[in-house]
Amino acid sequence: MTEIQKPYDLKGRSLLKESDFTKAEFEGLIDFAITLKEYKKNGIKHHYLSGKNIALLFEKNSTRTRAAFTVASIDLGAHPEFLGKNDIQLGKKESVEDTAKVLGRMFDGIEFRGFSQQAVEDLAKFSGVPVWNGLTDDWHPTQMLADFMTIKENFGYLEGINLTYVGDGRNNIAHSLMVAGAMLGVNVRICTPKSLNPKDAYVDIAKEKASQYGGSVMITDNIAEAVENTDAIYTDVWVSMGEESEFEQRINLLKDYQVNQQLFDLTGKDSTIFLHCLPAFHDTNTLYGQEIYEKYGLAEMEVTDQIFRSEHSKVFDQAENRMHTIKAVMAATLGS
């Protein structure tokens, strides 16, 4: 039997936002995830969490995050328990503090995917167990681990990589890419209309990390400047969950920021990869896609089907890596 390595040690820690961790800790989690991916590929069992019980709290719907946490828990030997928006009453019938104290008595770790960053912070404060942020309106740290793992798999390194995000600069992906990228020594470029620029508070955190660790942060509405010589182009949906009434406004603002072949040609490179946290509106094979086409005449939104299905696209590697990186976080913070 192959002897598995001890988990990367962040025992007892929570992952609430990227800035909670150092560059070395973030890199350690990525490297540990790469090891765990090899274990799974080769059928090597790695039950670091044998006998543990994990609560999966979801205020927002999810495919990848729920699947990744569920499979990661089982692979690690733990039992996951899903609690959806109809099962939990955070701040409605029961305070976050009281809920946290109850769950902390029953579970060994808690994942939370919802709206409020304060909610996940309070879960960590009052539960007494590791808490992992599966997404809030402010940050998406588990996504970042998968994103930068995917970049490292493709290029072999992270420091000095040029990463361009094109789209709504105010959403959680843009926030997290700026901070995590700057912390990892990546040159992060946020390409967005001026009216969708990220708030100064998030930019300031990212620039502080960049000065500390050697990355850089650029905010621009100039597409050619943003994608020149870039190694990775990243986009996200133009309308986030809860903003569906703003489709027309966002389409008008972002239609020139679609990731397409013309934009890829501006990079001047053949090796540039495409990333997306998914789901993506790249065709009309969804009810949303059909509705957008009927209302606005757009068959593709933030990315064209050509780019989404091209050899540049690493979106399904990226999605798979959610599982491996989440597994790394859980094992590192809770394993033995």
Curated annotation (Swiss-Prot):
Binding site for L-ornithine: N172, D236, S240, M241
Gene Ontology MF term list: amino acid binding; ornithine carbamoyltransferase activity
Any Gene Ontology CC annotation: cytoplasm
UniProt EC number: 2.1.3.3
Gene3D superfamilies recorded: Aspartate/ornithine carbamoyltransferase
Major location category of this protein: cytoplasm
Sites where the protein binds carbamoyl phosphate: S62, T63, R64, T65, Q89, R113, H140, P141, T142, Q143, C277, L278, R322
Subcellular location: Cytoplasm
Pathway: Amino-acid degradation; L-arginine degradation via ADI pathway; carbamoyl phosphate from L-arginine: step 2/2
Ligase in keyword set: no
Main EC class the enzyme belongs to: transferase
Reaction equations catalysed: carbamoyl phosphate + L-ornithine = L-citrulline + phosphate + H(+)
KW Cytoplasm (keyword) present: yes
Any one Gene Ontology BP term: arginine catabolic process to ornithine
Sorted UniProt keywords: Arginine metabolism, Cytoplasm, Transferase
Stored Pfam families: OTCace, OTCace_N
SUPFAM superfamilies assigned: Aspartate/ornithine carbamoyltransferase
Function per UniProt: Reversibly catalyzes the transfer of the carbamoyl group from carbamoyl phosphate (CP) to the N(epsilon) atom of ornithine (ORN) to produce L-citrulline.
Family: Belongs to the aspartate/ornithine carbamoyltransferase superfamily. OTCase family.
Listed name of the protein: Ornithine carbamoyltransferase, catabolic
Source species: Staphylococcus aureus (strain MRSA252)
Classification of source organism: Bacteria, Bacillati, Bacillota, Bacilli, Bacillales
Gene it is expressed from: arcB
